[in-house]
């Protein structure tokens, strides 16, 4: 199962899993894109691909998906879907911030609860949690996202300690900036313009690195120089020093 499978890391994870011979369940909001991806992966790799179009920020839709997955034998769950916002929390749309929390944390938790009992009972399985280096430190002007990823980071590493003895792998992916291709100047977002090209990772590289790490049951995989430096900063530099510096940088994304 791959959530957020219509683009970016999610699409790359689906492609890499198909290349490795896995049948797939693709989850995202945009059904038409998922159907096109499913046809392409089946044609290229000969695997069975099922589409479950779901808005994971909708509690009822998430509950329905979890009920469906709980009755299936799921070997790997890639909890990838997520969104981010930038700018002062007081100036952001409150409902969108709530939707971000539902998507980035509650849906991740619900999906994990849906599949982890069967994995433990079976004695095999793997969960890839897409957290973030942003979850390692306070980030003004990215508050909801950073807080949501702190939840995912902690959930992943805590759960890994619970299920390792049962043969279940749990790996946290804490990526930095990722993109499928370099945009043209006209298409570049503020993030593309602020973050230098050499700090970006390709979604294909991140997907392969993540699945290799999950296979080895690594606790955390941190691809890229920026994410590695943020992980170090979050662990060793006092938070009262990093917060204002990082906050000024992230404010640019909201402008």
Describe the residue ranges of each PLM region:
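SDR active-site lid
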Residues: 162-229, 236
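Substrate-binding pocket helix/loop in short-chain dehydrogenase/reductase
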Residues: 88-90, 96-101
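Active-site helix of classical SDR
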Residues: 112, 148
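Conserved glycine-rich cofactor-binding loop
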Residues: 6-7
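Residue(s) in the substrate-gating loop at a strand-loop-helix junction
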Residues: 132
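Conserved glycine-rich Rossmann-like NAD(P)H-binding loop of the short-chain dehydrogenase/reductase
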Residues: 20-36
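Conserved NAD(P)H cofactor-binding loop of Rossmann-fold oxidoreductase domains
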Residues: 80-85
């Amino acid at each position: 199962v791959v959530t957020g499978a219509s683009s970016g890391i999610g699409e790359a994870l689906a492609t890499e899993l198909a290349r490795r011979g896995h049948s797939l369940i693709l989850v995202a909001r945009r059904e038409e894109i998922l159907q096109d991806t499913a046809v392409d992966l089946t044609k290229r790799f000969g695997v069975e691909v099922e589409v479950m179009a779901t808005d994971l920020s909708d509690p009822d839709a998430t509950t329905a998906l979890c009920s469906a997955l709980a009755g299936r034998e799921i070997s790997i769950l890639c909890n990838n879907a997520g969104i981010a916002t930038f700018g002062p929390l007081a100036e952001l749309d409150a409902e969108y911030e709530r939707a971000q929390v539902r998507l980035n944390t509650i849906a991740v938790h619900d999906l994990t609860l849906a599949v982890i009992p069967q994995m433990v009972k079976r004695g095999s399985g793997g969960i890839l949690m897409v957290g973030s280096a942003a979850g390692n430190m306070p980030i003004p002007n990215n508050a909801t996202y950073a807080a949501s990823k702190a939840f995912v980071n902690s959930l992943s590493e805590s759960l890994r300690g619970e299920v390792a003895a049962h043969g279940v792998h749990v790996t946290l992916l804490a990526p930095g900036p990722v993109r499928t291709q370099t945009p043209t100047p006209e298409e570049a977002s503020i993030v593309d313009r602020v973050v230098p090209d050499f700090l970006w990772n390709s979604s294909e590289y991140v997907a392969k690195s993540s699945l290799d790490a999950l296979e080895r049951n690594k606790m955390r995989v941190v691809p890229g120089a920026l994410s590695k430096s943020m992980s170090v900063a979050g662990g060793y530099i006092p938070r009262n020093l990093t917060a204002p510096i990082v906050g000024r940088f992230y404010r640019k994304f909201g402008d």
